[in-house]
Amino acid sequence: LYDQTDWRYRTEPSCGTVAVTPCFGTIGTAPGSSVRNPGPQTDNSSFYQDTWRQTKQLAFFASVDYDLIPKVLTVTLGTRHFKFDNSAAGSVTSSFGCYGVAATPQGCFNPNYSYNLNAQNLSDSESGFKSRGNVTWHITPDVMVYYTYSQGFRPGGFNQNGGSLHATGPDGLPQFANPSSYQSDELTNNEIGWKTELFSHRLQWNGALYQENWDNVQIAFFNPGVTGNIFFNTNGQNFRIRGIETSIVARVMDGLTLQASGAWNHSEQTNEPALIDNVPGSVNFGKAITEVCDGAGQNCSPVGSPFGPKGSPSANAPPLQYNIRARYEWSVGGYQSFVQAGVSHTAHSYTQAGANPTLAQAGLTTSRLRFELEPYTLVEASVGVAKGNLNASLYVENLGNSKASTFTSTDQFIVEETPLRPRTIGVTFGCKF
């Protein structure tokens, strides 16, 4: 996978072969790096990354079903072996460190602010087994209960700014080196559920109770005041998620169908990791970073753990969601008609699982703030008619014109919100061929 991204917004003039400030040297790629466009970039390039990433995956799986009691009690066992070989290389170049630098045939590449990924030897391998077990019991032909145990994971990867030093301590030395890579995180699921069809199949009721353990969770950091002005990923929290979900479909009478589904879950951080001083020789090496100072080790300011305290909820995880819908269909004079209405609700959630503040404060070191997303309710309705291969419908979405943000971020130093779609009224026409 190749990635070439060029941020062309520099307005200062470029330096010539003899630098006369104010000017910037034209940035170039890391010497000897594996890039597709080597050498100097455009005169207005402020940042440029020319990288590639390769993942080789080998996997095989097996699954066996065995009827302990034919058509009544079945056991399923399965496993998957995986092997990932990951590697990355290339150049990530910044115009920092290029102010007043004379032009050269190779372009300006300052290793204090830019990164030669080839020199970091970014390669690793992961392998192992992830398995699944299931027991299914058909109490009757229309009532089934089950238990499932399953495992999953998300592969790790590399950071483009690995090894860069930040967070000066009271001894004047950096306390944190950005990690070159991050590991996979893992999910273990235990679930008990049921599936039923009752009252001559006029009522369908399904549901499940579950507990998920999500460990070594991958998390992205962007904290210019502590860990530099480039995103990097690492591993941190463990979460336990417990919940219940259910759905009902009821054919109340000919033509009338009611549907409802809902889920409640409680997510909780079960550990309390910290950002650890990982620079040998620094005064607090191996301990949690609790303060950041100026370059001389003076004027220190306290910093908290960005991972958040034990008991915090996971990100973007509303504790309650539900929807209810009713649909009535009938026929008159060869026309198939319907009317439908529904309501859905999403409870509040948080944009991050960490401990970042919800409002900008004096001395704040990060632009990645934590926001609470307000709960919202949506109402929709539609009516339609069809005959032969033609159909038409009238619909309205977000009937109450609810206003809420589905995601809020300050990563770009301004508050950005993704709003709900406003009330929308429309007409559709269709023809089947």
Positions of predicted regions on the chain:
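Transmembrane beta-barrel strands of outer-membrane/channel proteins
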Residues: 1-4, 77-83, 145-151, 194, ...
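Membrane-embedded beta-barrel scaffold of Gram-negative outer-membrane proteins
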Residues: 138, 144-154, 161, 174, ...
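C-terminal beta-signal and adjacent terminal beta-strands/loops
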Residues: 255, 333, 343-361, 384-433
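Residue-level signature of outer-membrane beta-barrel architecture
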Residues: 62, 66-68, 127, 135-139, ...
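Outer-membrane beta-barrel channels and translocator barrels
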Residues: 69-73, 140, 187, 199-201, ...
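Hydrophobic, lipid-facing positions within transmembrane beta-strands of outer-membrane proteins
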Residues: 56-64, 129-135, 178, 188-192, ...
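Gram-negative outer-membrane beta-barrel transporters
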Residues: 208-213, 232-354, 428-432
